[in-house]
Amino acid sequence: MKLVTFSVSTQVGEVVRIGALHRDFVVDLCAAFGWHLCERGVYAAPELANDIIPADMVQFLSRWPMAREAAETAFSFARNKGTQALSPSGAKIFYGPGECRLLAPLRPRRIKDYLVYEEHKKQAIKQKGLDLPDLWYRMPTYTNRNHLGLAGPGDDIAWPSYTEKLDFEFELALVMARGGRDIEASDAMEFVAGITIYNDWSARDVQADEARIGAGPGKSKDFDQGNVLGPCIVTLDEIDPSNVEMILRVDGEEWARGHTRGMKFSWQQIIENASSGETIFPGDVFASGTMDRGCCLELGRWIEPGMRIEMEAKGIGILSNRIVGSRPA
């Protein structure tokens, strides 16, 4: 499944739901599951459906694997009913283009952003006149991100007022469905719900200043909408996270291509590292770091306000955002 969080306009305002993509439609999984339970004669079917498939993705993941099984049942049930079907109460099950808005698929508990692409790291530290140390190859390393500074597919991204050099970073990220501690690499993927696209925005001039004083990323990455996730979470029965082709476009022009083959540490090693001596939780997001040539810094080409950034990952979809606002005066 391709799991999404979406909103629908109603007379009482925006209502947020969990869904799954079916061609150009979004299936309301809770509504479909409630109808399924009703047909089976379950008392209080809508209430039970809301309990098992809640409107919040992190809460949904916390009910894994029961919630996943319910979602799969609902998805199959809805497809059998057809895209024009309405529930006995008149509720829509399918939403077509323009009838709903995709949001970030989840509001993560936290984001750990790893750096496992060798060429990207080499280029990043080359800007500082340094070489990649042997120590980098011993274990995957990460920095924490502001999980509250979040945006989703289609959102306009405001150019931060304090930077001259805004940069995107094309990454993929695993979304966790189970919690645990000291997880071995051989068991790691059993804890994963799926994979999504992650854009880690960076203010490069500010980042350079922070590096000069020996500080980790601060305001260079910590601003509203600085983390973009979407368009969906693809469950692992539909995709191999270690075999994903990525295409970067700016205003429709292809700027770069990449592949998860460039990762020097595996997803399993990332999870093993993240959980070492530390409990991880459903709704945690672990990102790969930028694909090789997946940012302006490496490409030597810089974006401007008004440009649209498209990050396509085969098997996942396209994460598209436009930059609005202006550079500081």
Regions found by a protein language model. Name each.
Residues 1-12, 21, 32, 42-254:
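Active-site microenvironments in enzyme catalytic cores
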Residues 11-18, 28, 320:
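Short N-terminal binding/cap micro-motifs at the start of the first secondary-structure element
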Residues 14, 69, 95, 202-329:
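Catalytic-pocket segment enriched in acidic/His residues
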Residues 26-33:
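Catalytic Cys-His active-site segments of thiol-dependent hydrolases/isopeptidases
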Residues 34-36, 329:
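A short acidic, often aromatic-flanked loop/helix-cap motif at beta-alpha or helix-coil junctions
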Residues 37-43, 267-269:
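A short, polar/proline- and glycine-enriched secondary-structure boundary/capping micro-motif
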